[in-house]
């Protein structure tokens, strides 16, 4: 760690560098004195390098803080609201991944995730219906928690079709994206039997609330939608037969 007493040494080093560029010992200066000055200069240079590293870390931290609005959990809970009207403006890929990570991101080396899961069985699957995302082609993508990445499912902007499956709710069509949460019930029911269905429903609530709070932190608007035709959503998104849609969450910039 740097201490205040080191700064005179740093200043001395800078003065020496500016005046002579390098230390050249003269016959009037003993070898011991010359070596001592060189040692101080080397020490000053090392601490200058450390200062630069500290500054770089601070700059990086400031940039990261600027991406997400600093707020306590209490503030986020107070500010969270359902938003159904969105500006015609794109989201960034970074924002999208932050939202998906909040819902099902991996937080432990063994695979633990952001939302609690009965038996750590993780029956949920997250799909991204992208319509207006910077540098991301419109289409459907599936979230891979282990890599925090998207895999391509199908091309094309399907927001209008998804809105039709959600009984014509305009917010589903007008959001920059829709996050669709599906469940593979069998992952949980094979251990817990019929009770496992309840555990899945509890878990999707955990994941959705995480996404809501992340959106609030990012200054984005969203609403959780549960009214839709299951078969229609499954076909439009391109889900497998064992995946049942539970939530459609449109997200966009606030107007």
Residue ranges, per PLM feature:
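N-terminal amphipathic, basic helical "cap/leader" segment at the start of enzyme domains
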Residues: 41, 47-48, 53, 58-174
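Small-aliphatic-rich amphipathic alpha-helix that forms the alpha element of a beta-alpha
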Residues: 80, 99, 126, 177-187, ...
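Short, surface-exposed helix-loop/turn micro-motifs enriched in polar/charged residues
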Residues: 118, 222-225, 241
């Amino acid at each position: 760690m740097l201490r205040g007493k080191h700064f005179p040494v740093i200043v001395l080093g800078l003065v020496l560098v500016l005046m002579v560029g390098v230390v050249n010992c003269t016959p009037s200066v003993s070898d011991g004195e010359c070596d001592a000055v060189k040692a101080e200069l080397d020490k000053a240079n090392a601490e200058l390098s450390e200062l630069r590293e500290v500054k770089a870390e601070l700059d990086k931290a400031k940039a990261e803080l600027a991406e997400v609005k600093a707020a306590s959990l209490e503030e986020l809970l107070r500010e969270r609201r359902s938003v159904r009207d969105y500006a015609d403006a794109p989201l960034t890929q970074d924002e999208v991944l932050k939202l998906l990570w909040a819902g099902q991101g991996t937080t432990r080396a063994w695979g633990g995730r952001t939302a609690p899961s009965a038996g750590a069985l993780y029956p949920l699957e997250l799909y991204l219906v992208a319509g207006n995302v910077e540098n991301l082609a419109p289409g459907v993508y599936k979230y891979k928690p282990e890599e925090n990445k998207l895999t391509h499912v199908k091309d094309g902007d399907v927001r209008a079709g998804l809105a039709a499956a959600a009984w014509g709710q305009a917010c589903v069509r007008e959001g920059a994206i829709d996050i669709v949460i599906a469940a593979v019930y069998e992952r949980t029911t094979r251990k817990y039997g019929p009770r496992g269905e309840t555990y899945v429903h509890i878990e999707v609530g955990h994941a959705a609330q995480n996404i809501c709070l992340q959106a609030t932190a990012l200054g984005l608007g969203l609403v959780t939608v549960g009214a839709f035709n299951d078969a229609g959503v499954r076909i439009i998104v391109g889900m497998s037969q064992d995946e049942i849609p539970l939530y459609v969450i449109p997200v966009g910039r606030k107007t």
